[in-house]
């Protein structure tokens, strides 16, 4: 491929593709670009690309506008054509439906769930409030946020060196 053909290809690429309130890198493949979207990993991206009828190894920015729209529609309607066990929000608390949340909604939904647990004073909510581990991990020796535990050898050596210097100067 000559340099002129390479420049023509680069001019046709959209460097940013907007899907689900997120700018995706148009220079990456469809599968890898979709994986940057919150709530979409490599496996879900592969399923979405196949459902949209797009080659998942094609460059995301090189797709036509109608292909990008079909990818967007496939992301939005993921739960309709994917198995229920693949949804990231199964049996939603409020609706009882299986949903697949993408983009910034993932973090917002997570925060709402944590706040709901805090309000009803569940065990997990109390652990979240206190900043402690929630999922049953050990806390005796890991996850400490305060200063160092035990003997600080460097500080002791510095104090001894200062004491020795002070004692040596007085004699």
Curated annotation (Swiss-Prot):
Residues 128-171 are annotated as: Disordered. SUPFAM superfamilies: S13-like H2TH domain (SSF46946). Residues 160-171 have a biased composition (Acidic residues). GO terms for biological process: translation. Gene3D superfamilies: 1.10.8.50, 30s ribosomal protein s13, domain 2 (4.10.910.10). Part of the 30S ribosomal subunit. Forms a loose heterodimer with protein S19. Forms two bridges to the 50S subunit in the 70S ribosome. NCBIfam families: PRK04053.1, uS13_arch. Located at the top of the head of the 30S subunit, it contacts several helices of the 16S rRNA. In the 70S ribosome it contacts the 23S rRNA (bridge B1a) and protein L5 of the 50S subunit (bridge B1b), connecting the 2 subunits; these bridges are implicated in subunit movement. Belongs to the universal ribosomal protein uS13 family. This is Small ribosomal subunit protein uS13.
């Amino acid at each position: 491929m000559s340099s002129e053909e390479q420049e023509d290809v680069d001019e046709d690429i959209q460097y940013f593709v907007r899907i689900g309130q997120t700018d995706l890198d148009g220079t990456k493949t469809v599968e890898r670009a979709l994986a940057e979207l919150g709530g979409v990993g490599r496996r879900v991206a592969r399923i979405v690309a196949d459902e949209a009828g797009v080659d998942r190894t094609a460059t995301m920015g090189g797709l036509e506008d109608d292909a990008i729209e079909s990818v967007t529609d496939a992301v939005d309607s993921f739960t309709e054509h994917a198995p229920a066990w693949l949804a990231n929000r199964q049996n939603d608390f409020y609706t009882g439906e299986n949903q697949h949340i993408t983009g910034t909604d993932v973090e917002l939904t997570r925060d709402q769930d944590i706040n709901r647990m805090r309000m009803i004073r569940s065990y997990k909510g109390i652990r979240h409030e206190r900043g402690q581990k929630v999922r049953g991990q050990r806390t005796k020796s890991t996850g400490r946020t305060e200063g160092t535990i035990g003997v600080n050898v460097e500080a002791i050596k510095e104090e001894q060196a200062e004491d020795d210097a002070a004692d040596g100067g007085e004699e």
